[in-house]
Amino acid sequence: MEEKEKQKQRAAEAAARHLQDDMTIGLGTGSTAYYLILEAGRMAKAGMRLKAVTTSKATEELARSHHISVILPEETDCVDLAIDGVDEIDREFRAVKGGGGALLREKIVASKAKEVIWIMDESKLVERLGAFSLAVEILPFGYEIGRASCRER
């Protein structure tokens, strides 16, 4: 395994240490989140009860295949802990997310979370944000939550 992949795996394993029994968690999308899902799956297989709100169909399928129960955002009042990767992050801890095309779902999950942990390898650290292209996305998942939020503003 190359160093970049080892960093992703270590970051994911460190974040997974924050998972506790009976948590509702937000599971992110991407190459670093992949390692988190594997670790959370090992914990679930060992008996930890986790419910997950996922940020993409790919994450949903991977979570289910690793013994993690998946729910919709409408099925919970809050997410105890969301863990996701970032596309870029600067030294002020400002970050860019959503390059994988799951921006809206990522925002919905993060907005329901009591706490969020961002995981990444060192290649994501940049001097200046903006080198990464960002998608704009509108989709049915969580539509009512977004609509209600817009009405409040």
What feature does the model see in each segment?
Residues E3-K6, K57-R153:
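Conserved phosphate- and dinucleotide-binding cores of soluble alpha/beta proteins
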Residues M1-V86:
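N-terminal active-site beta-alpha-beta segment that forms phosphate/nucleotide-binding
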